[in-house]
Amino acid sequence: MDLKNFIRNIDDFPKPGIDFKDVTTLFKDGDAFKYAVDSIVEELKDKDVDLVIGPEARGFLMGTPVAYALGVGFVPIRKPGKLPGEVESYEYGLEYGTDTLEIHKDAIKKGQKVAIVDDLLATGGTMEAAAKLVEKLGGEVVSMQFLIELKFLNGREKLSNYDVNSLIKY
């Protein structure tokens, strides 16, 4: 199945000059969504994953069905102030400024093998920050899985120390 056929391109969103890849059209097609999830699960099945992590927000949509299919737990990584209780934070640089991600301090046990799943790999900044949070808590990132990779943004280079897989490349 060619998953590119299920991605809608929206010109000039969220601002002029951006060619937005809308994954909601894939999510609403049951066969395409199942194929995407099954493809990621196939990539992960021999990696002894203990836990799947998904960054806010579309990482939740891709990560939870993958975790379910693998029979492991799912942990969200969120923007600041969205998680109750004690959190670990990681601040990272953006093109203009900084951003922060948070995870519960008790989300990962030392030595757990973690797969990070998200919808899109762009510059790699968010995924690198997610990996740093996992490692800060003692987890091992065994794979990073994406529905889409925007190759021209070179995010894979920033993640060269990790196993990276994407189903669709632009």
Swiss-Prot record:
One annotated Gene Ontology cellular component of this protein: cytoplasm
Do you know which InterPro entries this protein is assigned to? Answer: Ade_phspho_trans (IPR005764), PRibTrfase_dom (IPR000836), PRTase-like (IPR029057), UPRTase/APRTase (IPR050054)
EC supergroup of this enzyme: transferase
Q: What is its main location?
A: cytoplasm
The EC number of this protein is 2.4.2.7
Q: Where in the cell is it found?
A: Cytoplasm
Q: In which pathway does it act?
A: Purine metabolism; AMP biosynthesis via salvage pathway; AMP from adenine: step 1/1
Output the NCBIfam families linked to this UniProt entry.
apt, PRK02304.1-2, PRK02304.1-3, PRK02304.1-5
Name of the protein described by the UniProt record: Adenine phosphoribosyltransferase
Could you tell me which species this protein originates from?
Clostridioides difficile (strain 630)
Q: What is the lineage of its organism?
A: Bacteria, Bacillati, Bacillota, Clostridia, Peptostreptococcales
